[in-house]
Amino acid sequence: VSYLKHAAQGLEECKQVLYLLGPVGGGKSSIAEKLKYLMQQVPIYSIKGSPVNDHPFCLFDVKEDGDILQKEYGIPKRYLKTIMSPWARKRLHEFNGDITQFKVVRVYPSVLDQVGIAKTEPGDENNQDISSLVGKVDIRRLEQYAQNDPDAYSYSGSLCKVNQGLMEFVEMFKAPIKVLHPLLTATQEGNYNPTEGFSALPFDGLILAHSNESEWQSFRNNKNNEAF
């Protein structure tokens, strides 16, 4: 509870993965299921049509708008630190900078619809890459858009789905180490890079990982994993 409270206040916990360590049958999955259930009870606000649940505050600049929003609406400046996704930035250019053209929707996270909640499991070294977390280009759209166009991208990765939500990473340390790298920047910096050459995608959510003790010991003893 203290972890979630401090993370919500923007303290150091918001830059950390919530990691559950324990033996098989110790209740790790039960805690994860309970958190996902609770997450579905409270709605989130996002820009209508955003494939990564862009928060409306991403349209404001903390330096230019921070004082006004705090004075007139009581919105703390720390809430304005989320970046705008490439998709939202493209829409902003199409609207000639008029943010009133954006619509805001109130959405309830859903496990079944994978809105704000997603589950990731480790795969084989040969068939799992970072696209399972960050998405990839949709080949079918390349007839209409350039490869580095935000509208040609498939935001199917777990990190894309869980902005403002919760991602459960089952047996995290069984995954190839290359797959885990986006988690570092997502938690530490609040954004991560897609597989194509456009700007970073926003992340403001909870990453919940769990594994048993033997997997953790093996992972920790490998000096190459020190950053994690």
PLM features: residue spans?
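Conserved ASCE/P-loop NTPase catalytic core
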Residues: 1-228
